[in-house]
């Protein structure tokens, strides 16, 4: 009741009894001073953050911002023999079988004229009465240092508010209950017939991935496609 029920129902907008067990099991309970969220032996984030990592990965690749894929689908699909789609799978098929359910998140970010707010990168608020689910204090992901290793005199915090998704909102989390999973399986059957498209990620696979798991899945998909492409090339020789 104190640690899980209020937080889970606030985040998902549904009674705990309607959530799959893996959602509840994601919340670790320890009687120690270990403040890690995960139990993995090795944990970390990219130096400089994920934005820097993605920028390094893109390199000289052309990036188009503020471009609706569906408005330019024919043109964009013609640019490559394979398309990797990580948006909502139901949106790809224009919701022809109905809308899947998602949770959305709203952020309120503040710059505080103080060196420390909560002493930790993330603090979750488990009571149901606090409107936000957690507060992120970004500097602690880099141990409170700037790019030159100097202490930062100010701090930036973001409060996260969970809400029900509706068309026009940004979807964040799939609602993996029985009803939605059944609808996803129908969309998956349609997706499997799209030979040109690889569906991936939380939205493309309608799966509540952790970051390490989704990176591993992306690498696996890339390797599988590379092997398939090599096999097709060899067969055509």
Where are these regions (language model features)?
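A conserved FAD-binding loop/helix module that cradles the flavin
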Residues: 205-222
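Residues within well-formed alpha-helices
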Residues: 7, 217-221, 234
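Short FAD-binding loop at a beta-strand-to-alpha-helix junction that anchors the flavin cofactor
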Residues: 193-206
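Conserved small/polar residues in nucleotide/adenosyl-binding loops
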Residues: 226-235
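Mid-domain catalytic core of redox enzymes
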Residues: 69-190
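Alpha-helical elements of Rossmann-like donor-binding domains used by nucleotide-donor carbohydrate transfer enzymes
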Residues: 52, 56, 186, 217-220
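Active-site/ligand-binding neighborhood in enzyme catalytic cores
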Residues: 1-82, 86, 91-93
């Amino acid at each position: 009741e104190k640690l899980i029920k209020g937080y889970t129902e606030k985040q998902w907008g549904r009674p705990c009894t309607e959530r799959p067990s893996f959602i509840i099991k994601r919340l670790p309970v320890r009687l120690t001073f270990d403040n890690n969220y995960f139990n993995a032996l090795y944990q970390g984030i990219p130096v400089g953050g994920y934005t820097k990592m993605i920028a390094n990965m893109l390199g000289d690749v052309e990036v188009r911002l503020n471009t609706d894929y569906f408005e330019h689908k024919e043109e964009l699909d013609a640019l490559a023999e394979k398309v990797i789609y990580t948006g909502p799978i139901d949106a790809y098929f224009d919701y022809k079988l109905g809308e899947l359910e998602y949770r959305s998140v709203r952020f309120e970010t503040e710059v505080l004229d103080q060196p420390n707010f909560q002493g930790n990168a993330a603090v979750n608020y488990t009571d149901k009465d606090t409107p936000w689910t957690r507060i992120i204090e970004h500097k602690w992901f880099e141990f409170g240092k700037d790019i030159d290793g100097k202490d930062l005199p100010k701090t930036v915090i973001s409060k996260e508010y969970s809400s029900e998704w509706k068309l026009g909102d940004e979807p964040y989390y799939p609602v993996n209950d029985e009803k939605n999973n059944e609808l996803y399986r129908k969309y998956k059957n349609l997706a499997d017939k799209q030979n040109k498209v690889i569906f991936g990620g939380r939205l493309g696979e309608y799966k509540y991935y952790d970051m390490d798991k989704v990176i591993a899945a992306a690498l696996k998909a890339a390797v599988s496609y590379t092997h398939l492409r090599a096999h097709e090339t060899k067969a055509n020789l």
